[in-house]
């Protein structure tokens, strides 16, 4: 029997391949694939259902329909295997050969492959140096092309229309050869001598000067070299023979009622065959030229449609007006081959069900319904039944299981013990969306989930479903247990903070348990142990909140005991603390933040096991006391503050006051609106404050009968205060006032909702509430998709970043400083550098020895040391500066956040980075509607008040001194910082244009001092010199209006919008100049620039013509726009823009060189700014006049300094300031968005993505390399080429880094398989085929698609050993070492075993 099995074994290809190459197929190759020609368009006989001979389903060509059975039925059964029936010509084989055998169609006339013709840039066009339109005219028989000019004056490749052709024929006769159609193009392609062309172009390159020509030549050169090196022949882009897909991949399925469902490909093939046969007949008949031509054109069109329907002209539609799905459509898009079948497959041994909460489970368990378990573990049960001799055959075992005999349940218990299963909840946004658990069999039909893992899954129990998967092999079970078990995933890979943190009820229970109450039963008593106190409480002699004293063992390694003041509840909690954990960790009121910290420090001090047990105990305790507390929401608990009415009345009066000011013309409508919004924002804060103080505290009598205040036990307050549920903002809406609402366009409606939910809303208030509520829901739906797409792009760009070595040996890194915004340190240095490796020694001024040596991994202890020594900047290693060629090194990455130690080799840090950034995106986008659209707008800031004592430093601020000795800022990007006595920066503030600064540079300041003030509602225009005002182009009624105030009689001048002016005033540019009394221009100090200020629309001028103005006076003010609400809506697109490296609109102009500024001659709409580097070297910028230029004449600027205000362009930052500055910029900007939402992500994830955006180089100097100047190449490719050149002693190539957006970077990866499965499949494959690309299968995606272990994690070692083995073979080592067990050996062994069994029976 073993021989038989050996014969049966399909002669499959060997599994061992290391790369995949894509190339053009030559006609010979296509014929060699084919098992026969398809000559007829018939498919199957509608009566017999047998395939027609020579048709599209022909059994002779493609193989038998049934296993080992020929069509006419002469030969049947296995014994005739391989026989070819002489009657019907069918070879006897397995029916599945119909999935792999191809046919071909011999075309009567060659046709062009549409991908190489129409996929831009057109490859055929580039090779022939003709435009796409011209080639199409030839191919679709509208014009002749000269193939061989002979001795005539015509040129090769010249197009001739019919008349020109006839004229030429008359003139030259047979001297020349001009034809039309694909044959002509094929002959032209054949004539190209690649070597010659390449040589000529290479010689031509240095001599040309025009940019466009150089671009064109390099494009052609690259294509020609690609053809030359890959061995592809240009004429193969024109096809003489068309391959036919195996029939089982384009099936024809009979439906009931005699109709057939067919794949669209069959229709497309039929059209091709019909037209081809008709063309053959016409050619045999010597039909007139015009008819043949038309038929050839139709053949070309039908082949186009088969390959890529709809690429040219209108798509061919089927019977139901739907475009037919062509071969190209089969592979692209979400439903295409790549994404549907290769990257994601359905798996066996899986099930799904609704989840319910399992509060009694341990952290590593989940409840699995018996019914599901029985089905999922069937094969294991069968084998166990046989093994124990309870069933003789598999069939018998099956019957036993179906009958659910009692012994089956015992065996199921046995099988399930210690066999982990995987639980997954869609959407799986990060790796914690799939975790392993040990199943516990339960009755019922719902899966039970442990409450602590809900955060990771983002699961709730309102009907969520989860899927179960069974790891089958031993290796899979091992991995599930050691890597994926929920107990091994306590920390979040995104931030390194615990993700197994109690939430909601548990938090509420622990909070209630650890609260203090004044004058509770048993206050002031002393107990010998926590256990004793607990006993007294259980007996009812103690209140759980009573303040008592307990004798506790001393901590920090000291022996003996001491008395601790605590409460009964905290003593109860102390019982579950791990041994050695200090009691003062929990001797406080436990809020969610505190609990998270406790779990974190437990993990760092006592390790995994203790933490898991502790977390479980916390949960049980929390649930128990949440139940005991009886905390619930009652309408009485929403206490409305008594002074609410008076606060609101006061606000109404203020608003009335402003309305009257507006009516009398003192303020503009915009200012009025802004001030009203401000009043209501402030009022809302006041009501909220008053309400919180009422809800948060209560007055009680203490033991002596005195009145004291304590934190209240109001359940709503407790829920918010503990962090269990709800926030101050929500309580404010329940018991304060709902406040301002946003209109559908995002602007704020100026009438707020003064009612709260307890009082109830009236119809008008309800109506304006609906805007925000609906917007929230609509946003959610739209943005979930956007966020998912962002994650997909991130994963794609970073998928092949794997830790490949321990240390790349670089000594560069990036400089880390604390992040300071305003008066707050947003992220202290110790948080930013935790888990990083130091790049260079860290010193402090007082010591000569370094505090930290280079190469140290900074853990908690080290960062405490840094903090203690007051270090405020550290150079750390970063993924961006890592020198590893493929992947990253462990030292540059630092700590594995989810494990807390240096990252292992093989860790797929790219995917983790992408998930960490993408996952909160979805969270954030889903989070818009929770506050119900209430507009949260901070009251506009109007001053800088500092918080710490220190010295003030001004940065980038241009100031002028007002006559009252104050400084007035006249620059936009200025900042002030406060520095402490060690010279460390403590606070940092932006200073707006027009701010009055009341402290001098480098002067000492006290805490609480106000150092700058400004008007938040207007942009001022400040005079920088003193003199008389002169109006230019300010004409009453044309460019400006006068508004007189009735009360004061003062008049203001307001500029009119250019769009609303009469024709006369369209082109006028209103501005004010400062002149001397004689009327001469006054220049800005130290420059030759006149002091003149253009006035934008709506500007209000405060002075009259010819009035005197002092330095620092406000000449005009521009009311600010209505403020829109900030929502993550701005956030997610912002993150996408940063990662896509989009150029911002009106981006800032940065100085290209360092030097002195002066202004040259102005053009019509622009100013010329010249930066002089030296006598003979300068750089010019043309800047539109409306842009605000932030440098003066004669000022010195550094390279990369901002000259004209605007959003920064990341490409400029990279070019002018380098990689470090760019990394800093992107990291900080992305973090700003997430921080606004309170999401923590570690910087290194963003850095990994930035590294991938920077992996290309633009060649600046080609040396002796194969690269061309201006070409974009992978850095690794450039370095490899340089290594080769160095070895040969030649000149190396040099390049500068270039920033690509994530989409572009994904499409530009080395691996064409990965790029094609991402986006623009056609373009990627066309390009790859032409250049004969080889995919080395380095990334994760490529390996998933060829069905291999990924080269990361546990698969990393497998790939390494394969590589090592290959190297040994290549080195001519021990050949026997290469002999590994192949599939056939295994089958052979199996058949032997089966035979042995047979003999025994």
Swiss-Prot record:
The gene is rpoC. The keyword NAD does not apply. Mg(2+) binds at residues 460, 462, 464. It is an enzyme of class 2 (transferase). Its cofactor is Mg(2+); Zn(2+). It catalyses: RNA(n) + a ribonucleoside 5'-triphosphate = RNA(n+1) + diphosphate. Belongs to the RNA polymerase beta' chain family. It comes from Legionella pneumophila (strain Lens). DNA-dependent RNA polymerase catalyzes the transcription of DNA into RNA using the four ribonucleoside triphosphates as substrates. It comes from the Bacteria. InterPro entries: DNA-dir_RpoC_beta_prime (IPR045867), DNA-dir_RpoC_beta_prime_bact (IPR012754), RNA_pol_asu (IPR000722), RNA_pol_N (IPR006592), RNA_pol_Rpb1_1 (IPR007080), RNA_pol_Rpb1_3 (IPR007066), RNA_pol_Rpb1_3_sf (IPR042102), RNA_pol_Rpb1_4 (IPR007083). GO terms for molecular function: DNA binding; DNA-directed RNA polymerase activity; magnesium ion binding; zinc ion binding. This is DNA-directed RNA polymerase subunit beta'. The RNAP catalytic core consists of 2 alpha, 1 beta, 1 beta' and 1 omega subunit. When a sigma factor is associated with the core the holoenzyme is formed, which can initiate transcription.
């Amino acid at each position: 029997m073993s021989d038989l099995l050996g014969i049966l074994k399909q002669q499959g290809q060997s599994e061992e391949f290391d790369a995949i190459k894509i190339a053009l197929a030559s006609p010979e190759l296509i014929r060699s694939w084919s098992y026969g020609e398809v000559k007829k368009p018939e498919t199957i006989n509608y009566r017999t259902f047998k395939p027609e001979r020579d048709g599209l389903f022909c059994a002779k060509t493609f193989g038998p329909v049934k296993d080992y059975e020929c069509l006419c039925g002469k030969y049947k059964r296995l014994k005739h295997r391989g026989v070819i029936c002489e009657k019907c010509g069918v070879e006897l084989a397995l029916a599945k050969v119909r999935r792999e055998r191809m046919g071909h169609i011999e075309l009567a006339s060659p046709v062009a492959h549409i991908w190489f013709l129409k996929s831009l840039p057109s490859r055929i066009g580039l090779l022939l140096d003709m435009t796409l339109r011209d080639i199409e005219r030839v191919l679709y028989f509208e014009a002749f092309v000269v193939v061989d000019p002979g001795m005539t004056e015509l040129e090769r490749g010249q197009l001739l229309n019919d008349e020109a052709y006839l004229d030429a024929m008359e003139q030259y006769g047979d001297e020349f050869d001009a034809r039309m159609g694909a044959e002509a193009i094929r002959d032209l392609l054949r004539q190209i001598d690649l070597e010659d062309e390449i040589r000529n172009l290479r010689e031509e390159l240095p001599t040309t000067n025009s940019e466009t020509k150089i671009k064109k030549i390099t494009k052609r050169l690259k294509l020609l070299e690609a053809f030359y090196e890959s061995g592809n022949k240009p004429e193969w882009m024109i096809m003489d023979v068309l391959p036919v897909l195996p029939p089982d991949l384009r099936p024809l399925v009979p439906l009931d009622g005699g109709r057939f469902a067919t794949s669209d490909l069959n229709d497309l093939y039929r059209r091709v065959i019909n037209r081809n046969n008709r063309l053959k007949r016409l050619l045999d008949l010597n039909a007139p030229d015009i008819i043949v031509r038309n038929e050839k054109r139709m053949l070309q069109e039908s082949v186009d449609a088969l390959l890529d329907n709809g690429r040219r002209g209108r798509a061919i539609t089927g019977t139901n007006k739907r475009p037919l799905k062509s071969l190209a459509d089969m592979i692209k898009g979400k439903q295409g081959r790549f994404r549907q079948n290769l990257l994601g497959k359905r798996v066996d041994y899986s099930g799904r069900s609704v989840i319910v909460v399992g509060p009694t489970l341990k952290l590593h368990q989940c409840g699995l319904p018996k019914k599901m378990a029985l089905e999922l573990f069937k094969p294991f049960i069968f084998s166990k039944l046989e093994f124990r001799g309870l069933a003789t055959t598999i069939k018998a075992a099956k019957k036993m299981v179906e009958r659910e005999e009692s012994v089956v349940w015992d065996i199921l218990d046995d099988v399930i013990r210690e066999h982990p299963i995987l639980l997954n909840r869609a959407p799986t946004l990060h790796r914690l969306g799939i975790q392993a658990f040990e199943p516990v069999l339960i009755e019922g039909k719902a899966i039970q989930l442990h409450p602590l893992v809900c955060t990771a899954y983002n699961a709730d129990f309102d009907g969520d479903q989860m899927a179960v998967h069974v790891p089958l092999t031993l290796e899979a079970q091992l991995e599930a247990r050691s890597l994926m078990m929920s107990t091994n995933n306590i920390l979040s890979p995104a931030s390194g903070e615990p993700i197994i943190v109690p939430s909601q009820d548990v938090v509420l229970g622990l909070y209630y348990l650890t609260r203090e109450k004044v004058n509770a039963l048993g206050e002031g008593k002393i107990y010998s142990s926590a256990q004793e106190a607990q006993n007294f409480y259980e007996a009812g002699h103690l209140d759980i909140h009573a303040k008592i004293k307990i004798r506790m063992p001393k901590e920090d390694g000291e022996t003996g005991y001491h008395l601790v003041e605590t409460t009964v509840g905290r003593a109860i909690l102390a019982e579950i603390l791990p041994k050695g954990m200090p009691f003062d960790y929990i001797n406080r009121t436990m809020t969610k933040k505190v609990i998270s910290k406790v779990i974190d420090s437990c993990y760092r001090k006592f390790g995994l096991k203790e933490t898991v047990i502790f977390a479980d105990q916390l949960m049980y305790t929390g649930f128990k006391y949440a139940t005991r507390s009886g905390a619930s929401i009652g309408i009485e608990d929403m206490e409305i503050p008594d002074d609410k009415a008076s606060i609101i009345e006061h606000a109404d009066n203020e608003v009335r006051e402003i309305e009257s000011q507006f009516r009398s013309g003192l303020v503009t409508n915009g200012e009025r609106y802004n001030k009203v919004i401000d009043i209501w924002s402030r009022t809302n804060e006041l009501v909220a404050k008053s309400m919180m103080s009422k809800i948060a505290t209560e007055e009680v009598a203490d033991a002596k009968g005195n009145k004291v205040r304590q934190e209240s036990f109001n359940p709503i307050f407790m829920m918010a205060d503990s962090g269990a549920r709800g926030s101050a903002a929500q309580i404010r809406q329940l018991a304060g006032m709902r406040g301002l609402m946003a209109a559908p366009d995002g602007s704020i409606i100026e009438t707020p909702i003064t009612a709260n939910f307890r009082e109830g809303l009236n119809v008008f208030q309800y109506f304006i509430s609906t805007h925000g509520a609906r917007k929230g829901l609509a946003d959610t739906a739209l943005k979930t998709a956007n966020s998912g797409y962002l994650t997909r792009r991130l994963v794609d760009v970073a998928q092949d970043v794997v830790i490949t070595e321990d240390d790349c040996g670089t000594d560069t890194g990036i400089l880390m400083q604390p992040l300071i915004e305003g008066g707050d340190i947003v992220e202290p240095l110790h948080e930013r550098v935790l888990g990083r490796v130091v790049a260079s020694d860290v010193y402090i001024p007082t010591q000569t020895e370094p505090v930290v040596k280079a190469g140290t991994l900074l853990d908690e202890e080290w960062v405490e040391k840094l903090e203690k020594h007051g270090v405020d900047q550290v150079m750390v290693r970063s993924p961006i500066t890592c020198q590893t060629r493929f992947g990253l090194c462990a030292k540059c990455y630092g700590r594995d956040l989810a494990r807390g130690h240096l990252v292992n080799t093989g860790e797929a840090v790219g995917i983790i980075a992408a998930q960490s950034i993408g996952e909160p995106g979805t969270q954030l986008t889903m989070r818009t509607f929770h506050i119900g659209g209430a507009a949260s707008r901070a009251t506009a800031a109007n001053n800088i008040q500092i918080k710490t004592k220190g010295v003030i430093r001004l940065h980038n601020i241009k100031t002028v001194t007002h006559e009252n000795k104050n400084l007035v800022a006249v620059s936009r990007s200025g900042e002030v910082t406060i520095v402490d006595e060690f010279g460390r920066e403590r606070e940092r503030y932006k200073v707006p244009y027009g701010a009055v600064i009341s402290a001098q540079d480098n002067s000492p300041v006290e805490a609480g001092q106000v150092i700058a003030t400004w008007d938040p509602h207007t942009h001022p225009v400040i005079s920088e010199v003193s003199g008389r005002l002169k109006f230019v182009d300010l004409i009453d009624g044309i460019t400006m209006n006068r508004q007189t105030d009735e009360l004061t009689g003062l008049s203001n001048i307001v500029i009119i919008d250019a769009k609303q002016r009469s024709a006369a005033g369209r082109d006028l540019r209103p501005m004010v100049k400062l002149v001397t009394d004689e009327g001469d221009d006054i220049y800005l100090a130290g420059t030759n620039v006149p002091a003149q200020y253009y006035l934008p629309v709506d500007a209000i001028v405060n002075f009259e013509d010819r009035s005197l103005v002092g330095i620092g006076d406000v000449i005009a003010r521009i009311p600010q726009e209505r403020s829109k609400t900030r929502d993550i809506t701005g956030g997610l697109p912002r993150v996408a823009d940063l990662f896509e490296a989009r150029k911002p609109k009106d981006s800032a102009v940065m100085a290209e060189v360092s030097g002195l500024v002066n202004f040259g001659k102005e053009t019509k709409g622009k100013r010329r700014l010249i930066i002089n580097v030296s006598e003979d070297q300068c750089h010019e910028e043309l800047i539109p006049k409306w842009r605000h230029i932030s440098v003066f004449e004669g000022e010195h600027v550094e390279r990369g300094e901002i000259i004209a205000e605007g959003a920064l362009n990341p490409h400029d930052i990279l070019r002018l300031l380098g990689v470090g500055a760019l990394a800093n910029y992107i990291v900080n900007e992305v973090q700003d968005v997430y921080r606004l939402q309170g999401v923590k992500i570690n910087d290194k994830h963003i850095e990994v993505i930035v590294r991938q955006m920077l992996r290309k180089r633009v060649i600046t100097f080609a040396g002796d390399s194969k690269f061309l100047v201006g070409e974009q190449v992978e850095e690794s490719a450039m370095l490899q080429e340089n290594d080769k050149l160095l070895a040969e002693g030649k000149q190396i190539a040099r390049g500068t880094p270039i920033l690509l957006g994530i989409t572009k970077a994904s499409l530009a990866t080395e691996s064409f398989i990965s790029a094609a499965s991402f986006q623009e499949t056609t373009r990627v494959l066309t390009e790859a085929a032409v250049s004969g690309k080889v995919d080395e299968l380095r990334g994760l995606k490529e390996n998933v698609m060829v069905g291999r272990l990924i080269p990361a994690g546990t698969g990393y070692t497998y790939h390494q050993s394969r590589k090592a083995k290959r190297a040994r073979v290549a080195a001519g080592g021990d050949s026997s070492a290469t002999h590994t067990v192949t599939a056939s050996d295994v089958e052979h062994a199996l058949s032997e075993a089966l035979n042995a069994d047979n003999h025994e029976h």
